[in-house]
A protein has these predicted regions:
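Solvent-exposed beta-strand/loop surfaces, strongest in extracytoplasmic domains of secreted
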Residues: 1-134
Length: 134
């Protein structure tokens, strides 16, 4: 006795593919007196760390947060603070407490987004001018 097998083709709906996560770029700049091309600052004088977060096509990222940290080379540092990104930028006040080279780092993140984290850093040399802010 022969057994006949029947095949039924059932169309299957594919799950939609998640959008590929983009990786923004993050650059850090410092403003304040006398930060300039030499990247010098005075101990105890206020500066502002500015993170610029953009997509590869130059579009500013409009959501997420940036965490800023500061440390001296070879020494653990501290979190300066976490601030929201608005129109591609996040900024926070920073005051060097001691003389020396300070590494200011920033990490962009957004848990509710399809964007990957991004990071960057810059180095500032703080000089002790006995409280004089130039």
């Amino acid at each position: 006795m022969a057994v006949a097998a029947a095949c039924i083709a059932v169309p299957m709906a594919a799950a939609p593919q998640a959008a590929a996560a983009g990786t923004p770029t993050l650059t850090i700049s410092m403003t304040g007196s006398p930060v300039g091309p030499a990247k010098l600052a005075s101990v105890g004088c206020g500066q502002t760390a500015v993170a610029t977060v953009k997509m590869a096509d130059g579009t500013p990222v409009s959501h997420g947060s940036v965490e800023f940290t500061s440390h001296l080379p070879g020494i653990s540092g501290n979190v300066v603070g976490t601030v929201p990104v608005t129109n591609g930028t996040a900024s926070i006040p920073w005051v060097p407490g001691v003389a020396g080279q300070h590494i200011i780092s920033a990490i962009y993140f957004d848990d509710a987004s399809d964007l990957r984290p991004a990071s960057g850093q810059t180095m500032i040399t703080a000089m002790n001018l006995n409280g004089v802010c130039v």
